[in-house]
């Protein structure tokens, strides 16, 4: 039977999803949780709705965590002991990969043969585990990097730490071993081929999605009331981890420039910064708070803890514009979520953001991180109601092109393709 013939009959029963450094159960914006967590949880739930069981393996960070937790019907999150029962910095995790891999293999060993049909690893640490599990189980490995060290180092933010050589080598190994490589945009596909020598025929582009039922337009007045923001305020917002890569300082510096241009704006300006620094999730973003004081805008800046559920929706709905000033983004889920709520986005023209934001239609793309350029873009949207109204309509329309259902359908096609190719190759070798 040909590989195409196998593909028609193939449907995965159970997928092993590897997410070593962060759990889909964690609140995005805390610790190292972000868009990847949302991606894993949303696609896992959609897979389960299609009859595919999903088991997510992640490192246990507390002795109180049960061995397994049901995220949704058909989706199980397995906590694998590897190192101390506490959050670790990502730089400390490579030394725990042996223990983590052992836990993953031990879990499979207690099941019937052929329990998992495919492995999908997320981030390079998980790819290292997936590579070994792939060879042990005899199933294909699909890998999503989410971020790439060589790309991050080329766009390093001031004060940020370069990714180590060990990560670069680890990524190169995973790229060479994976059966399929899933990327968010064609730009990322080109980066994998050009910078990591990935085989072009192994790379597949699948755009992430957005929960269009949860993130949708609603009452701005109600959202502002819930946040304690005046109904007539000019509201700028940022949501995400507080780290140099995400560049929330760009928003604060641009805000200070706006106030210098028009001192009267201070009376009605509110800047919402929702998120926390990477780490334990308990810290406040002290350096960013100090910057607000230094810039003289601490009176208009409100620092909120990482927001989830309706609280995050309220932040998006309350804002006149959401800023995504990152130095690099493989895609930018925050931009999609905000636009789905009908809020225009001003974003940096980097990475996958030109796909997530339709320039001059759903928001504006800024080609630099220059303070005055950002102040101009923010003012154009936030201070001009006629511009904001047009972009708001375009924002929702643009976001509707993306859904987790569509993302999951594309992933399933890749899974079936990888399984067919893997089994076909095995058949040829056997013959």
UniProtKB/Swiss-Prot annotation:
Mg(2+) binds at residues 316-317, 319, 343. GO terms for biological process: mycothiol biosynthetic process. It catalyses: 1D-myo-inositol 3-phosphate + UDP-N-acetyl-alpha-D-glucosamine = 1D-myo-inositol 2-acetamido-2-deoxy-alpha-D-glucopyranoside 3-phosphate + UDP + H(+). It comes from the Bacteria. It holds the Pfam family Glyco_trans_4_4. It is an enzyme of class 2 (transferase). Its EC number is 2.4.1.250. Keywords: Glycosyltransferase, Magnesium, Metal-binding, Transferase. 1D-myo-inositol 3-phosphate binds at residues 21, 32-37, 90, 123, 147, 167. InterPro entries: Glyco_trans_1, Glyco_trans_4-like_N, Glycosyltransferase_grp1, Mycothiol_biosynthesis_MshA. One of its GO terms (molecular function) is D-inositol-3-phosphate glycosyltransferase activity. SUPFAM superfamilies: UDP-Glycosyltransferase/glycogen phosphorylase. UDP-N-acetyl-alpha-D-glucosamine binds at residues 27-28, 35, 241, 246, 307, 329, 337. Homodimer. Belongs to the glycosyltransferase group 1 family. MshA subfamily. Catalyzes the transfer of a N-acetyl-glucosamine moiety to 1D-myo-inositol 3-phosphate to produce 1D-myo-inositol 2-acetamido-2-deoxy-glucopyranoside 3-phosphate in the mycothiol biosynthesis pathway. This is D-inositol 3-phosphate glycosyltransferase. It comes from Saccharomonospora viridis (strain ATCC 15386 / DSM 43017 / JCM 3036 / CCUG 5913 / NBRC 12207 / NCIMB 9602 / P101) (Thermoactinomyces viridis).
